[in-house]
Amino acid sequence: MAIATRTLKDTKIATGSGAAGGKVTVLVNMNDNTTADSLVVDASGLAGHANGAKLDITRIWWALVQGTADDNTGWVSLYFEGDTDVTAINLVGTGHYDGTAGKITNSVTNTGATSGDIKLSAFGTSGYVLIELRKDSAFTA
């Protein structure tokens, strides 16, 4: 019934002409988590964040097991937060997404400020999710 998130890496492109973007790596650990809408990446807290900046998912590793409940459990959903949230990917079991099929693009729209945040909903799940993200050009050096 707990979730813990840790930012392992938050880089930005070196200062200079046209310098923008960067990479972020986040580790999410869960113990029999049933929490909906857990904030796992607060984009405004990342280096170089500006209004309208978005994060795209480039790679993911995960190892998830079912918690104590027995129905429809043992999986998580990652989604991009917006006026209407957009599901990025659903994860179950153990695996990885290596990005060879391309990044998972943050396609949310907002009528107001764009947060760029990523949330996770867990369904009776224990384990971890390691997420590698790419900052778009709205992140400044």
Where are these regions (language model features)?
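Short, intrinsically disordered N-terminal pre-domain segments
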Residues: M1-N29, A141
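A short beta-strand element within beta-rich, extracytoplasmic domains
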Residues: K54-Q66
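Short, surface-exposed beta-strand/strand-loop-strand elements in extracellular ectodomains
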Residues: G67-L91
